[in-house]
Amino acid sequence: MTNYRVESSSGRAARKMRLALMGPAFIAAIGYIDPGNFATNIQAGASFGYQLLWVVVWANLMAMLIQILSAKLGIATGKNLAEQIRDHYPRPVVWFYWVQAEIIAMATDLAEFIGAAIGFKLILGVSLLQGAVLTGIATFLTLMLQRRGQKPLEKVIGGLLLFVAAAYIVELIFSQPNLAQLGKGMVIPSLPTSEAVFLAAGVLGATIMPHVIYLHSSLTQHLYGGSRQQRYSATKWDVAIAMTIAGFVNLAMMATAAAAFHFSGHTGVADLDEAYLTLQPLLSHAAATVFGLSLVAAGLSSTVVGTLAGQVVMQGFIRFHIPLWVRRTVTMLPSFIVILMGLDPTRILVMSQVLLSFGIALALVPLLIFTSDSKLMGDLVNSKRVKQTGWVIVVLVVALNIWLLVGTALGL
């Protein structure tokens, strides 16, 4: 009886520790459902129905592995990816990495910020510029939570992630997708046209986020409690749960667009405003409102995550620190410029996601090299199978990017 009580107590303690260590992956996962995902998934679903769902499935599986590796690097070494690159690579390479990572972070933030502004515009009936001002204010307020530590921020962002997931359960109920065709689209690969390749690259860029690869390793580098193996085990659960939720949201986005737009003849729906306006008569005003609210929630939470990632990148690569409010102010400027110039915000969102796909390999190559180094990682070093899978992902990403560049250059 005593042994049972001891085992029961130790089991509860292990579960309590696992719960305490969960959270970083939810911050990382919010980057996988930002407004860039809304734009690319809606465009892909409206244009090609369920044919590109398989891209979301495979991109999400790749993302799970990548985020586990990133988190593992922080746990095993106590340093994040940017710091490891700084410590192991020549200075010119480090500066190159910092510049491209900042560009990627700004491209990401552009999509997130404009997406939230569009969301405010749709649900409140304000102008895009007024929506941007509201987004800026809301972002500053959310970032103030960081002063209280990482946990309050994890809870708020995790709550927003769950809200977006719940919103898309509602959207699926409204749109009633064809489950047989949906399942087929998830399993059978198809790239019918050059536009499909462009959108597939966009989906990949929107699903696997380079800035979150840098960020996740910093969120786990200061995790304490239990052994390294216990922290790693808890982190794998954290990533599996958070990324499964994010993957479901991405699939639901594309499936809803396919069911609501593609199969009703609205294959040209390509921007968020049009999607909102088209949803009202096709499904209902409630469905359109839920769409707008989920866009605001995704945009606000992901732009906060983008700001944190930018801070990690700067501190890690060049040991330079600026206050978060200064970084937030500077990174808002491109969004306001795009809005004031009257550029098509949804096109900017999709282009930013394609740009992101070029940063994936640059972040992933050193991550694979470091996590495969037994001197750095000790007992958490990558297995042979993980190494091989990681390099296959790099080759696939690079091949898709080359295909995209050649196709764009030749006007295919």
Curated annotation (Swiss-Prot):
InterPro entries: NRAMP_fam (IPR001046). One of its GO terms (molecular function) is symporter activity. Keywords: Cell inner membrane, Cell membrane, Ion transport, Membrane, Symport, Transmembrane, Transmembrane helix, Transport. GO terms for biological process: iron ion transmembrane transport. The chain crosses the membrane at residues 20-39, 52-71, 96-118, 126-145, 156-175, 197-220, 239-258, 277-297, 328-344, 351-370, 388-406. One of its GO terms (cellular component) is plasma membrane. Residues 40-51, 119-125, 176-196, 259-276, 345-350, 407-412 are periplasmic. Residues 1-19, 72-95, 146-155, 221-238, 298-327, 371-387 are cytoplasmic. It is found in: Cell inner membrane. It is a multi-pass membrane protein. It comes from the Bacteria. NCBIfam families: nramp, Nramp_1, PRK00701.1. Belongs to the NRAMP family. H(+)-stimulated, divalent metal cation uptake system. This is Divalent metal cation transporter MntH. It comes from Shigella dysenteriae serotype 1 (strain Sd197). The gene is mntH.
